[in-house]
């Protein structure tokens, strides 16, 4: 996955590709948040659990489509292909950064 992105997002994408929930959670601030499928996950432990559950439930591959940066916010468009209804699907991953970490991630269609 090649993408010119700030370091915390590049690290997140590498951890995502490796399916490493621990590494994903370390990309976030201590009180970082993820909003996905109508639910919020706050803190690294909750983010780790969310990532593990998503990887087990959906078994997907993420392919980057494009990215746009606006200040401390980066929107990454990704195509997810896998074992879930409606596959493939394109989703926006909206990252907000703080102190070289991800403060929040919102995933939406």
Residue ranges of predicted features:
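Alpha-helix boundary/capping and short turn/kink residues
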Residues: 18-21, 37, 85
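A short gly/proline-enriched turn/hairpin at secondary-structure junctions
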Residues: 31-42
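A beta-strand edge to alpha-helix "cap/lid" segment located at domain peripheries
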Residues: 35, 48-109
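Flexible, active-site-adjacent loop/turn segments at secondary-structure boundaries
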Residues: 26, 39, 82
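Short, low-complexity N-terminal intrinsically disordered segments enriched in polar/charged residues
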Residues: 1-26
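Short beta-edge strand/loop motif at the mouth of beta-sheet-based domains
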Residues: 41-49
């Amino acid at each position: 996955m090649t993408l010119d992105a700030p370091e915390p997002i590049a690290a997140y994408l590498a951890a995502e590709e490796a399916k490493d929930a621990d590494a994903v959670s370390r990309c976030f601030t201590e009180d970082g948040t993820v909003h996905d499928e109508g639910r919020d996950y706050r803190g690294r432990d909750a983010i780790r659990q969310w990532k593990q559950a998503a990887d087990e439930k959906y078994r997907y591959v993420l392919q980057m489509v494009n990215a746009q940066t606006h200040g401390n916010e980066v929107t990454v468009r990704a195509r997810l292909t896998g074992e879930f209804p409606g596959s493939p699907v394109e989703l926006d991953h909206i990252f907000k950064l703080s102190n070289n970490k991800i403060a929040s991630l919102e995933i939406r269609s």
